[in-house]
């Protein structure tokens, strides 16, 4: 029998707060850290506006991205991986080039996700664990991340909130007030998202796959990277079907040497889909986009291919063990609930498949955050580091 947990409170549309006894933090956190590459006053005001949602712990921050992150230019820049993304940030979003080398920009994502209706209302939910281990170079010493919630409101586009692992631009917990970390790379945040939701109730997340990275090479299509695609979808897609149509217009490239990714998306109409890029010949790069949907077995996802094209490969559903136990537990739990769940039950499912410090030492073996998205109300309830009794509530826009 699945364990149930305290009900997640869905708070009003436009704020973030903590649900324990602490006073919610809403004012910017003071910092003396530099931002060497930024001279524009609006950009500097923005990067100095982060709020530490726990006061001084440095574990979870929130900000509103108020300047233009030039999505149209990003879509035409040929961003095929993290190196090209870093170049775009330096050339298009910085005001001047750094005098020292930029921090390494990396990207990865383990994770579990699912979608289902709320059994007690007409709302639709999406659950998501972001699982990833960061280790100090050459060691098995785990480095702890700062989570950053990023609110965006692009001109002519859709407002959204998305979530970033700050360690992917070399920010550690407490970076914002460590008197050392340069804050310039906060300009990259719109393109570092791992999941998010927009004002139409469309949500998207990314999850890791084993095997060669996706590489599409249609000469008539522009090339985009995983996170650039997700930014585009949150800014411009009102629902799952629009998102699928947008992805078909681009070459997808994912630059991890031995990994690829698939997308899990859902919307406020109850629609959901898994988008994968496939190739039954695993010695070649995946290059065929598939949108998988239409039955309850596709309501959940972990870290192997679910496409029939890949089923009998080493990375497909019939042979891969990467995330298989988590997948079976999600499938079993959703079936027990007849593919419907309350927010508390959805949180319970995330707890069952969460990974702790004594689990796998693989890159995908540690749960950094867990979220229940209410797609109908456009809210997100997040717990970090398996601290299930404490949640942070987010709306599309940040509380003033």
Protein language model features and the residues they cover:
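C-terminal motif of bacterial Sec signal peptides marking the signal peptidase cleavage site
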Residues: 13-17
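A recognition module on extended beta-rich or small alphabeta surfaces enriched in W/G with H and D/E
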Residues: 155-167, 307-320
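Non-transmembrane alpha-helical segments in soluble domains
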Residues: 231-234, 244-247, 331
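Secretory/export targeting leaders with adjacent low-complexity proregions
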Residues: 245-255, 263
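Bacterial N-terminal signal peptides that target proteins for export
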Residues: 1-5
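Long, charge-rich alpha-helical interaction segments
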Residues: 314-343
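Extended amphipathic alpha-helical segments with heptad-repeat/coiled-coil character used for oligomerization
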Residues: 257-311
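N-terminal mature-domain region immediately after signal-peptide cleavage
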Residues: 18-238, 252-253, 339-400
């Amino acid at each position: 029998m699945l364990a149930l947990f305290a009900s997640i409170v869905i708070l009003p549309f436009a704020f973030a707060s903590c649900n324990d006894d602490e006073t919610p933090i809403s004012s910017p956190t003071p910092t003396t850290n530099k931002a060497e590459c930024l001279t524009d006053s609006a950009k500097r005001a923005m990067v100095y506006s982060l709020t530490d949602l726990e006061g001084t712990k440095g574990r979870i921050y929130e900000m509103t991205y108020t300047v233009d992150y030039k999505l149209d230019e990003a879509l035409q820049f040929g961003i095929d991986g993290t190196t090209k993304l870093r170049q775009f940030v330096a050339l298009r979003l910085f005001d001047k080039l750094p005098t020292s080398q930029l921090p390494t920009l990396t990207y990865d994502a383990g994770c579990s996700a699912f979608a289902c209706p709320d059994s007690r209302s007409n709302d639709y939910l999406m659950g998501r664990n972001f699982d990833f281990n960061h280790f100090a170079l050459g060691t098995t010493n785990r480095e702890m991340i700062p989570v950053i919630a990023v609110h965006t409101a692009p001109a002519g586009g859709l407002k959204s909130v998305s979530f970033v692992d700050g360690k992917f631009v070399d920010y550690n917990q407490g970076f914002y007030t460590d008197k050392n970390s340069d804050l310039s790379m906060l300009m990259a945040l719109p393109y570092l998202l791992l999941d998010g939701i927009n004002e139409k109730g469309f949500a998207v997340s990314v999850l890791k796959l084993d095997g060669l990275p996706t590489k599409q090479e249609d000469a008539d299509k522009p090339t985009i990277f995983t996170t650039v695609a997700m930014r585009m979808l949150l800014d411009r897609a009102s629902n799952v079907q629009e998102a699928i149509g947008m992805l078909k217009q681009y070459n997808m490239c994912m630059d991890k040497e031995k990994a690829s990714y698939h997308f899990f998306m859902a919307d406020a109409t109850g629609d959901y889909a898994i988008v994968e890029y496939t190739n039954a010949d695993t010695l070649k790069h995946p290059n065929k986009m598939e949108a998988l949907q239409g039955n309850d077995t596709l309501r959940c996802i972990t870290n192997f291919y679910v496409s029939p094209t890949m089923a009998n490969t080493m990375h497909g559903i019939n042979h891969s063990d990467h995330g298989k136990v988590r997948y079976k537990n999600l499938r079993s739990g959703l079936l027990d609930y007849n593919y419907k769940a309350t927010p508390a039950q959805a949180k319970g499912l995330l707890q069952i498949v969460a990974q702790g410090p004594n689990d796998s030492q693989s890159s995908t073996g540690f749960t950094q955050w867990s979220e229940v998205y209410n797609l109908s109300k456009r809210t997100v309830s997040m717990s970090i580091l398996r601290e299930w009794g404490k949640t942070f509530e987010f709306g599309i826009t940040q509380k003033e």
